[in-house]
């Protein structure tokens, strides 16, 4: 009998990615007034011997020699960004996780000619992108695969992606084991007072003409600290991640401000959350060397304070010398960030329990369709147990030192 043929792009839909060793899948979405809309899912390319037929894990298995920990990670980028952080994939796979990254509609791999880069008028629009990705990963709403029901889903978002995933998690808590936020844009740079002053004018502009461009405030300093073409160490596509960022439009900023207002009211997330932030911000109109070792996009003190409104069990890790995207920081800060994530995963994301043998005393004690992995019940129990401790931590977070406030 002939050997089964290895899967190809024609048989699976997956095609070679722009990143060596990775592959991508285009996810068709509902069209909008600019035409065709897609998202793009990215994962490590598997070797030819890993046939798609009988693939119980829906692709993207951990590396050979690494024990499968039973968790799957979906990463979502921030504003004017796309997935290129291969070291992040390396890290999660070394933890025994399957790793996937999503380029949202009108970003990176998903940007089509004639589209307004990054433009939406509601962050809930991304629900369709996220659901399409989760369906491919085996975590869709209608997933009936018992193998996948016992795997935990960890979401990781950077900046605006962190805000988007926080809002999505609050609406879909029964499907999530944990949430990792890399410098999430939970609050406006001028904090809540500035946001509330600005919001009415932005909302009016969004109603009148959501695509009118707003003044450019990105001076390119963050790109200078990150890109190898300048003072940074990373190679990426400057067309997909421009030096001064995409043009900001009123409709998009209005969507962000609405999302931040929702966080301020409290999202009530009951699953464990990890927030990674630099210890300092440098928000200045001129370049300084400190921008190589601090967040030049967000006010980290305001974000740290707002993170207490995410839910009941929030761990805040402040990383000395970290950039806005902490995994693009210099090696010492990057290593510290990864160690914080690894520690959090070990402590807060339980591994699946071994399935009971048929006929054993334990068999039949789990409700049909629930599986032996119960992240939400565990998280809610843990959250209740530490609620008083979290209140104390929140008070300490509001007095966190070591952050540089923006100078006039």
What is each stretch, according to the model?
Residues 1-66:
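N-terminal cap/lid segment of alpha/beta-hydrolase-fold proteins
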Residues 45-104, 111-113, 290:
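Short, surface-exposed "cap/lid" segments of acyl-processing enzymes
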Residues 79, 103-108, 185, 320-323:
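Short beta-to-alpha linker loops that shape the active-site pocket of alpha/beta-hydrolase fold enzymes
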Residues 119-141:
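Alpha/beta-hydrolase active-site loop
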Residues 141-159:
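Alpha/beta-hydrolase fold nucleophile elbow
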Residues 160, 164-248:
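Alpha/beta-hydrolase-fold enzymes
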Residues 215-314, 318:
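Serine-hydrolase catalytic core
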Residues 313-408:
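Catalytic active-site module of serine/aspartate enzymes centered on a nucleophile-bearing elbow/loop
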């Amino acid at each position: 009998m002939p050997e089964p043929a290895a899967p190809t792009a024609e048989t699976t839909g997956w095609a070679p990615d722009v990143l060596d060793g990775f592959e991508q899948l285009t996810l068709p979405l509902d069209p909008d007034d600019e035409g065709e809309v897609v998202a793009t899912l990215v994962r490590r390319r598997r070797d030819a011997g890993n046939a798609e037929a009988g693939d119980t894990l829906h692709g993207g298995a951990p590396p050979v020699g690494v024990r499968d920990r039973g968790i799957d990670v979906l990463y979502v980028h921030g504003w004017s960004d796309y997935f290129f952080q291969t070291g992040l994939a390396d890290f999660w796979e070394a933890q025994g996780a399957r790793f996937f990254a999503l380029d949202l509609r009108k970003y990176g791999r998903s940007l089509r000619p004639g589209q307004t880069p990054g433009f939406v008028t509601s962050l809930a629009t991304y629900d369709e992108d996220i659901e399409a990705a989760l369906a491919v990963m085996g975590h869709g709403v209608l997933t009936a695969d018992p193998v996948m029901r016992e795997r935990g889903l960890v979401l990781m978002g950077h900046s605006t992606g962190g805000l988007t995933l926080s809002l999505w998690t609050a609406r879909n808590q029964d499907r999530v084991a944990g949430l990792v936020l890399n410098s999430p844009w939970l609050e406006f740079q001028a904090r809540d007072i500035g946001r509330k002053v600005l919001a009415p004018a932005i909302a009016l502009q969004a109603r009148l003409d959501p695509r009118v461009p707003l003044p450019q405030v990105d001076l390119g300093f963050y790109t200078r600290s990150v890109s190898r073409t300048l003072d940074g160490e990373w190679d990426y596509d400057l067309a997909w991640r421009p030096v001064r960022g995409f043009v900001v439009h009123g409709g998009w900023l209005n969507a962000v401000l609405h999302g931040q207002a929702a966080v301020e009211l409290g999202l009530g997330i009951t699953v464990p959350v990890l927030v990674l932030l630099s210890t300092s911000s440098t928000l200045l109109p001129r370049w300084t060397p400190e921008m190589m070792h601090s967040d030049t996009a967000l006010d980290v003190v305001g974000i740290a304070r707002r993170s207490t409104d995410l839910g009941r069990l929030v761990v805040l890790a402040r990383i000395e010398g970290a950039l806005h995207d902490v995994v693009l920081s210099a090696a010492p800060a990057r290593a510290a960030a990864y160690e914080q994530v690894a520690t959090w995963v070990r402590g807060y994301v339980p591994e699946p329990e071994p399935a009971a043998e048929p006929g054993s005393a334990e068999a039949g004690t789990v409700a049909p369709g629930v599986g032996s992995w119960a992240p939400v019940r565990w998280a809610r129990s843990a959250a209740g147990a530490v609620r008083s401790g979290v209140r104390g931590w929140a008070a300490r977070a509001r007095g966190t030192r070591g952050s540089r406030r923006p100078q006039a």
